């Protein structure tokens, strides 16, 4: 079973990945192709967070799964926005 501390720490990491992705998304929206590497890195961090979440989800209780599911929605939303951006 996942500990509360491990889930909280993971959610903090996800929030960091989201902030980085949002920043890069906003920059890419304004600058087009100038920072492709950073934009791609932020997409990779989102993907890694989603992959790690699958493992953690399996060992979580119902309350933790709910928190993880909400974060998963946010990560998937950002991932989709980044894919759809004409970058």
Residue locations for each model-derived region?
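N-terminal acidic leader/helix
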Residues: 2-35, 72, 82
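Short, structured coil/loop segments at alpha-helix boundaries
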Residues: 4, 61-65
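Short, charged, amphipathic alpha-helical segments
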Residues: 8, 36-47, 65-73
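Short E/K-rich amphipathic alpha-helical oligomerization segments
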Residues: 22-59
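Amphipathic alpha-helical coiled-coil segments
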Residues: 48-62, 77-87
């Amino acid at each position: 079973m996942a500990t509360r501390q491990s889930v909280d720490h993971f959610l903090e990491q996800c929030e960091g990945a989201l902030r980085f992705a949002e920043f890069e998304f906003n920059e890419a929206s304004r600058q087009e192709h100038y920072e492709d590497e950073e934009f791609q890195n932020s997409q990779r961090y989102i993907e890694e967070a989603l992959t790690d979440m699958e493992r953690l989800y399996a060992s979580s209780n119902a309350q933790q799964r709910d928190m993880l599911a909400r974060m998963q929605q946010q990560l998937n939303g950002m991932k989709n926005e980044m894919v759809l951006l004409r970058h």
